[in-house]
Amino acid sequence: MSSQVFVNPEEIDVFINEIRGFLDSLNSSTNRLNHAFETLSSSWQDRKRAEFEEEYRELLRVLKIFENNSEEKIQYLSMLSQKAKDYLSS
Protein backbone atom coordinates (compact mmCIF):
# COMPACT_ATOMS: atom_id res chain seq x y z
CA MET A 1 0.00 0.00 0.00
CA SER A 2 1.49 3.31 -1.00
CA SER A 3 0.69 6.52 0.76
CA GLN A 4 0.49 9.87 -0.91
CA VAL A 5 0.75 13.34 0.48
CA PHE A 6 -0.68 16.33 -1.31
CA VAL A 7 0.93 19.62 -0.40
CA ASN A 8 0.25 23.10 -1.67
CA PRO A 9 3.38 25.15 -0.92
CA GLU A 10 1.57 28.45 -1.40
CA GLU A 11 -1.01 27.53 1.25
CA ILE A 12 1.78 26.47 3.59
CA ASP A 13 3.55 29.79 3.06
CA VAL A 14 0.33 31.72 3.76
CA PHE A 15 -0.17 29.75 6.98
CA ILE A 16 3.45 30.35 8.03
CA ASN A 17 2.98 34.09 7.52
CA GLU A 18 -0.29 34.03 9.47
CA ILE A 19 1.19 32.18 12.43
CA ARG A 20 4.24 34.48 12.46
CA GLY A 21 1.94 37.50 12.44
CA PHE A 22 -0.13 35.97 15.23
CA LEU A 23 2.97 35.29 17.32
CA ASP A 24 4.26 38.83 16.76
CA SER A 25 0.89 40.27 17.75
CA LEU A 26 0.68 37.97 20.77
CA ASN A 27 4.14 39.00 21.94
CA SER A 28 3.36 42.67 21.50
CA SER A 29 0.07 42.37 23.38
CA THR A 30 1.70 40.31 26.11
CA ASN A 31 4.42 42.93 26.58
CA ARG A 32 1.80 45.69 26.87
CA LEU A 33 -0.23 43.66 29.35
CA ASN A 34 2.88 42.83 31.41
CA HIS A 35 3.71 46.52 31.64
CA ALA A 36 0.14 47.44 32.63
CA PHE A 37 0.04 44.69 35.26
CA GLU A 38 3.38 45.77 36.73
CA THR A 39 2.12 49.36 36.92
CA LEU A 40 -1.11 48.23 38.58
CA SER A 41 0.79 46.12 41.13
CA SER A 42 1.67 49.21 43.15
CA SER A 43 -2.00 50.04 43.75
CA TRP A 44 -3.68 46.61 43.66
CA GLN A 45 -2.38 44.48 46.50
CA ASP A 46 -4.89 42.00 47.82
CA ARG A 47 -5.66 38.28 47.67
CA LYS A 48 -7.51 38.58 44.35
CA ARG A 49 -4.47 40.22 42.78
CA ALA A 50 -2.26 37.37 43.97
CA GLU A 51 -4.74 34.85 42.55
CA PHE A 52 -4.85 36.71 39.26
CA GLU A 53 -1.06 36.90 39.10
CA GLU A 54 -0.78 33.14 39.62
CA GLU A 55 -3.29 32.46 36.83
CA TYR A 56 -1.64 35.05 34.60
CA ARG A 57 1.83 33.54 35.11
CA GLU A 58 0.43 30.11 34.21
CA LEU A 59 -1.10 31.56 31.05
CA LEU A 60 2.24 33.11 30.11
CA ARG A 61 3.94 29.75 30.65
CA VAL A 62 1.45 27.99 28.36
CA LEU A 63 1.75 30.72 25.73
CA LYS A 64 5.55 30.35 25.77
CA ILE A 65 5.18 26.61 25.17
CA PHE A 66 2.81 27.35 22.28
CA GLU A 67 5.27 29.87 20.85
CA ASN A 68 8.16 27.40 21.04
CA ASN A 69 6.09 24.60 19.50
CA SER A 70 4.92 26.95 16.76
CA GLU A 71 8.49 27.92 15.92
CA GLU A 72 9.34 24.22 15.52
CA LYS A 73 6.31 23.71 13.27
CA ILE A 74 7.23 26.78 11.21
CA GLN A 75 10.67 25.30 10.56
CA TYR A 76 9.10 22.00 9.53
CA LEU A 77 6.50 23.67 7.32
CA SER A 78 9.15 25.86 5.67
CA MET A 79 11.17 22.77 4.82
CA LEU A 80 8.05 20.98 3.54
CA SER A 81 7.09 23.96 1.40
CA GLN A 82 10.57 24.19 -0.09
CA LYS A 83 10.64 20.47 -0.88
CA ALA A 84 7.26 20.77 -2.58
CA LYS A 85 8.44 23.79 -4.59
CA ASP A 86 11.60 21.94 -5.63
CA TYR A 87 9.56 18.90 -6.66
CA LEU A 88 7.02 20.96 -8.60
CA SER A 89 9.72 22.89 -10.45
CA SER A 90 11.61 19.76 -11.53
Name each model feature, range by range.
Residues M1-S90:
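N-terminal secretion-targeting helices of virulence/extracellular proteins
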